[in-house]
Amino acid sequence: MKNDVILPLTRAIAGVVVLFLVTAFGILFFLPNQTGTLFAWSIKPHMSSMFFGSAYLGGAWILAQAAFGKNWHRVQAVFPAVTVFTIAMLIATLLHWERFSLGTIPFIAWLILYIVSPFLIPALWMYNRRTDTYQPETSDVVVSITVRLVTRFIGTLVLLCVTIGFFYPTLFINIWPWT
């Protein structure tokens, strides 16, 4: 079945995740002083909460494309990136367990989401790949190999910096733009 559609199961799950992401955005961005009770943990300073909230809004927009879009090839590249993010969030949760609002409904929702997502998101990607024609549409821009290689290089550098910051956060705390 190579018709480049987004399958109903993929759409439905993406739609549910969008609801979680929009809710997280609302709490983190508009109610940063209430993250201790309304979110999985208390985030300080408030600017960090708003920063995370804006990232969740970006994720909601991307996954809304999977929930409401038409073509699989337009959204398929997001799924591996979301998988990496959810794995990192699960690891961060386990590493910083004591900082979470354990036993609260927001934390339980967080924990379930980040235990299930690292498996569910790649499973959806594999499931929906059977519809991919691997052919660009006539209106699609074909990116040159040079641009793709430069982008991969930059992406690799960013991934390296993020990985270092993830495991050695003190290296970045002093240069974080707000404290």
Task: Show the residue positions of the predicted features.
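Surface-exposed interaction/gating patches
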Residues: 7-26, 134-179
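Hydrophobic alpha-helical transmembrane segments and adjacent interfacial helices
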Residues: 25, 29, 84-99, 156-167
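Structural signature of hydrophobic alpha-helical transmembrane segments
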Residues: 45-55
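Membrane-interface interhelical loops and short amphipathic "cap" helices
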Residues: 30-45, 99-107, 167-179
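Short, Lys/Arg-rich, polar N-terminal cytosolic tail immediately upstream
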Residues: 1-7
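Residues within membrane-spanning alpha-helices of integral membrane proteins
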Residues: 11-14, 18-21, 53-56, 79, ...
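Hydrophobic, ordered structural segments
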Residues: 58-145
